[in-house]
Amino acid sequence: EVSVMPVKYIERLEQDLRKVNGSHRDTVCIDFCAGNDACVLTTMHAALRRQDISLVCGTGDAGKVSANGKIYEDAVAYALVRNQRGRVKTYKENIYQPMDEHRFIASKTDKKNYVLGELNGHSARQVYQDILKVTEKQILTQTFQNPFGKLNGDDTCIISIKEVQGNALVCFRQVNDSDVLVLLKLADYKEVVRDTIQKIRADFPRPSAVFSVNCLFRYKLFTEHGYMQEYLKEMSALGKHAGLVGYGEHYNDQFVNQSMTCVVFE
């Protein structure tokens, strides 16, 4: 019942945490969610943070998850993975940078349907078009280059545009009234990837495995730029690697778009 009351079964996660008896140094939570991601992550994080355990993974487009051979709708499936031979650490990669001259206050939002109505009191669609000089039809591909970012302290949560709805924009994650947003632009993504790999190597000279989630839009962007195979080759240098392409990425209590999240095992 994640769409209406994700907290209803939180005791199951609390019991599993006691059984695993892990810590932030050796345990990670990997989850797959069927919807209402932001609320689900906030709920799960309330239990995980007591032991400072990180969470990564994401969501797809089918609105279903599978666990132990059964398919569930309106649910979240998770696994608590404890590394018995070393540490674990999670990472989030952002290949965009803020356009500081384009900051906005969101309004006329529809939290349930992820609608962004206005930016600084003007049509969200028109503002986006005017700044980037694109047609309405081009908006859905321009978001690969220029998504929005929600400012969260020193961090930025990326927000992708899903579709145009009249003068509004429908996004892939929730936007609330009075949220502070900034328009983002594509950075030197090859350099960002190299920096991520260097950070992982510095933290884990001998990693045993990596599990990652890449956004579908990152996959499309890398493919269009002829970089996808090079990206996979560079990441494979870290060792054994498994992962998936998703519709939205999870990182602790954050539901983000157009990102890569991963967990590395020592």
Where are these regions (language model features)?
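Hydrophobic alpha/beta core scaffold segments
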Residues: 1-266
